[in-house]
Amino acid sequence: LAMAMGDAVADAQARAMAAAYAIAGKEKEKLKQCFKDMTLAAIDYAKHKVEKHLFKCI
């Protein structure tokens, strides 16, 4: 059951991505840049959290 649920989620994600790309069309580059920016922001945020935690420990 858990595997079936996982497959359903993966399928839904794949369909959502396909739809997003189909809608985006020529916007694909902008979409890629957006994902890149979000990833970098997430990394910066995680680093900041880790550093803050480190300073608390010291």
Swiss-Prot record:
Signal peptide: none annotated. Neurotoxin that could be considered for development as an insecticide, since ingestion at high doses is toxic to both Drosophila (D.melanogaster) and blowflies (L.caesar). It is not toxic by ingestion for bees, aphids and weevils (S.orizae). Keywords: Cytolysis, Disulfide bond, Ion transport, Membrane, Neurotoxin, Secreted, Target cell membrane, Target membrane, Toxin, Transmembrane, Transport. GO terms for cellular component: extracellular region. Disulfide bonds join C34-C57. Belongs to the formicidae venom precursor-01 superfamily. This is U11-myrmicitoxin-Tb1a.
